[in-house]
Amino acid sequence: SRCKCSEGGSKVMILMIDNYDSFTYNVYQYIGSLYPQIQVVRNDEITIDEIRNLQNLEALVISPGPGYPDSAGISKEAIKTFGKEIPVLGICLGHQAIGEVYGGKVVPAKELMHGKMSEITINNKNPLFEGLEDKIYAARYHSLIIDDETFPEDLKVIGRDEKGQIMAVC
């Protein structure tokens, strides 16, 4: 299932697609502390065939970035191609791209959230949030969300903010 994380160890290879965002390397450093075999590549500097040829690829991380998912280079195509084979974690723009790939629409949020903290209610039974309380605080830097009214049947909402907006999907 794309909702589960792989076990740790040096054989696990994670590819992070960088959507030209300054936060990418913060995420890279954190993931790298758990899974040392992580590679970052810009969204316009790799092909699907090159991704397919990576040895021991266990997961994809789609980084934050500016704009809408259609401006995220190979990100949406990578989600379409590998999303049913390996776990894909989308952060901000990556999260929105997952929503679009599975049939949802990305729309402006009710309010801009640039550098603001919010309480997020999560499904802590999902492996992504294992070990966390059912409410967490998260820093937010976005102005777009996955639309609730067009939310894809193939996905589940596993996190919402205090206004009910979708913050995490699986």
Model-predicted regions and their roles:
Residues 37-45:
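A short beta-strand-loop structural module common to alpha/beta enzyme folds
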